[in-house]
């Protein structure tokens, strides 16, 4: 459980961070090297996800989607300075509950 959570967090940081760097380059006129670093981070995200121990690609990526939503809310708040509202938090927590059910519910 700790390894799965760690990998989801690392993948999220790589994906959101990479996307943010590309956003800064294309939308905010920042230097092209930020876009290149962003592309590398996005590629790294794809690699990190393969280290998950769960056997199903679909389950891993669907569960990661819930983690991504929660991390994106935090990123927007801490890095981009946009405070989430109550509904953002409720939605993000619902997603995390879904992740827990998908990954750790008892299966035959």
UniProtKB/Swiss-Prot annotation:
Compartmental location: Cell membrane
InterPro entries: UPF0060
Transcription regulation found in the keyword field: no
GO cellular component, one term: plasma membrane
Keyword Nucleotidyltransferase carried by entry: no
Keywords annotated in UniProt: Cell membrane, Membrane, Transmembrane, Transmembrane helix
Cystine bridges: none
Pfam families assigned: UPF0060
Annotated membrane topology: Multi-pass membrane protein
Main location: membrane
Domain of life: Bacteria
Transmembrane feature ranges: 6-26, 31-51, 60-80, 86-106
Similarity annotation: Belongs to the UPF0060 family.
Protein known as: UPF0060 membrane protein BH2744
């Amino acid at each position: 459980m700790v390894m799965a959570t760690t990998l989801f967090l690392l993948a999220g940081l790589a994906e959101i961070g990479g996307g943010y760097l590309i956003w800064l380059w294309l939308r905010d006129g920042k230097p092209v090297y930020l876009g290149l670093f962003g592309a590398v981070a996005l590629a790294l995200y794809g690699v990190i996800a393969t280290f998950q121990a769960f056997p199903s690609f679909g389950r891993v990526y669907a569960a990661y989607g819930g983690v991504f939503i929660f991390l994106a809310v935090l990123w927007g708040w801490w890095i981009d300075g946009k405070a989430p509202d109550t509904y953002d938090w409720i939605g993000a927590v619902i997603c995390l509950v879904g992740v827990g059910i998908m990954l750790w519910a008892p299966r035959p």
